[in-house]
Amino acid sequence: MARFTLPRDLYHGKGALEALKTLKGKKAIVVVGGGSMKRFGFLDKVVSYLKEAGMEVQLFEGVEPDPSVDTVMKGAAAMTEFGPDWIVSIGGGSPIDAAKAMWAFYEYPNVTFEDLCIPFNFPTLRTKAKFCAIPSTSGTATEVTAFSVITDYKKGIKYPLADFNITPDVAIVDPELAETMPKKLTAHTGMDAMTHAIEAYVSTLHCEYTDPLALHAIELISEYLIPSYNGDMDARAKMHDAQCLAGMAFSIALLGIVHSMAHRLVQLTAADISFMDVQTQCTCQRLSASTQQSQKHR
């Protein structure tokens, strides 16, 4: 038996951010990374829309790239003190991943990080809060997945946390946020999305539900990544959708050796994970092609 878990609601297209006005609750904590969401005015919009929904709002700012266990614990403590019934995270993969882990510690203060590192071992969430994810980059697709990546810097290890419980309740995929990405980030996240789609398609766990998502993501990325890199904002919107489709596919079909290798190499080299994904993807494809060729001549 297989399971296909996605957010209950996914709002997409320009202006989708306004869907925050429809959330029902009393308190919302907004988890955010660096200053880009504030600088471009999106953080103010999020706070305004949540207040319009009748909620008291508190910010947890400064989630670093490759979020740490320490940051997760600080965020969980802030949530415990504030008592939100909505956790809203906006930004790239890092603040959303961090907020997912914070959510678990907020609802279960006595759980350990080691407990959460066991795949599909999370306690049942949503006893205190629901989760809304708003991506600003077009790569990780953590807004629709059952995964989070947290780094234990004391051990020098990036831990992938996996459980259907941490699939967000609401995802808001608004391309206006992605329009602010610089060219380098557009390229790296776009290739990260392509890697997700390819790995999902060739996964041994792929199925009739994941293949159409992965294939269409590959088609969209092939057509729109370069125009998106060159500043075409319609293409940028297509890429924002494509990375989300890739995320839906790999959340079910899972990833493979490419990401396993890339995560370890990032620890050794401090390179960007998206860049390393591309390098290992190319290496694995060459290896696969040479293996298939040699088998033909046996």
List each language-model region with its residue ranges.
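Structural motif
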Residues: 9, 28-29, 58, 85-88, ...
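Glycine-rich phosphate/pyrophosphate-binding beta-alpha loops
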Residues: 139, 244-275
